Amino acid sequence: MTIKQGDKVQVIAGSYKGEITEVLKVIRKSNSLILKNINIKNKHVKPKKEGEVGQIKQFEAPIHRSNVMLYDEESQIRSRSKFIISQDGKKVRVLKKLVKN
């Protein structure tokens, strides 16, 4: 998966389409991501002990990685990514729209 924790992404599908946010967590097993302030759900929690009050907790639910694209803030472009080998021999991840073949 080419999207990593801390990357800036743009949501390209769903009710949050067009939103630009940060990746908080990557779930490789299900190919999904948890994004900051995106796909917020409510969970109703029952009281566990006597005298305790029930709660409604909000959490960020995962979104599939096919619904987001990497985003570059400097050029304000979203794009897929690829890996190239730099002149000093390191493997570097770059956006396809920003690099010429």
Curated annotation (Swiss-Prot):
GO terms for biological process: translation. Keywords: Chloroplast, Plastid, Ribonucleoprotein, Ribosomal protein, RNA-binding, rRNA-binding. Disulfide bonds: none annotated. InterPro entries: KOW, Rib_uL2_dom2, Ribosomal_uL24, Ribosomal_uL24_KOW, Translation_prot_SH3-like_sf. Transmembrane segments: none annotated. It is found in: Plastid, Chloroplast. One of its GO terms (molecular function) is rRNA binding. GO terms for cellular component: chloroplast; ribonucleoprotein complex; ribosome. It holds the Pfam family ribosomal_L24. Part of the 50S ribosomal subunit. One of two assembly initiator proteins, it binds directly to the 5'-end of the 23S rRNA, where it nucleates assembly of the 50S subunit. Belongs to the universal ribosomal protein uL24 family. This is Large ribosomal subunit protein uL24c.
